Amino acid sequence: LTVNAMAMAEDGRLIDPYGGFEDLKKGVLRHVSAAFEEDPLRVLRVSRFRAKLPWFRIAEETKAMLRRMVESGEVDALVPERVTAEIRKALKEANPSIFFDELEANGFIARVYPEWKQTDFSRGLLDRLASGFTEEEKFAASVASVDPDKLLNLLESLRMPKKLTEFAQLFSESLRDGFENAADGKSVLSVLRRKDALRRPERFAQLLRLLKAAHRIDSDEKWLTSVEAVRSLDFRSISESATDKSRIPQLIEEASVRAIDETLDKLTDQH
């Protein structure tokens, strides 16, 4: 890019053979020469630059070149791990949704990841998460609008770390399964087990935080206190006191449901 092709001479003179300073003043991202096409990873890097500096725009001739690089199949040869690395960097930028907008505009998404659709919901959520949220949360937001039937195929092709793909699947499921409507001890316990909340309470708390950011739940209090109520039970004591050992699972189930019901009653009284 012309803005990256400037240098300062020892005597303080600006060395600017391609007009980078003028492009910098105007906020324009412009390629230097036809050699730009030699590295198809630049399709992603320029898009990421836009997400980092949203007040810049891509020059029309550079946009055309990016589209040619996609249409010619140059991007098909990209090593998936290099693509994944660029995506992960883009998720850390100030306006990550712009990265995906640019990749849609130049045809990269349609050609390489046709399942990866963005909507106003996923774009808005992604940008709300730009500051103070984790990589898992941002990646989950970026695939929030993907058809659930196509999500696994997309995740496999992206080759993201396991913790990112698992959390993305959990969030996608939680957007659609109506879990938030659980209102009594038995149904809440079923949700906690389905979300693996009792074994992985930190991840569940992270999920709730993201669901609040997505305006899917108003509060996480019911869920966090229910997790704490069950995890604080003395399962060993329950097991040891059972005269019929075959009933231990049922006794634990009943104690867990009771603990959650008591918690829900307290919350109702408080509010």
Report each predicted region and the residues it spans:
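Glycine- and charge-enriched loop/helix tracts that form the active or gating conduit
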Residues: 1-160, 271
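C-terminal subdomains that position terminal phosphate/3'-OH groups for nucleotidyl transfer/ligation
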Residues: 102, 115-271
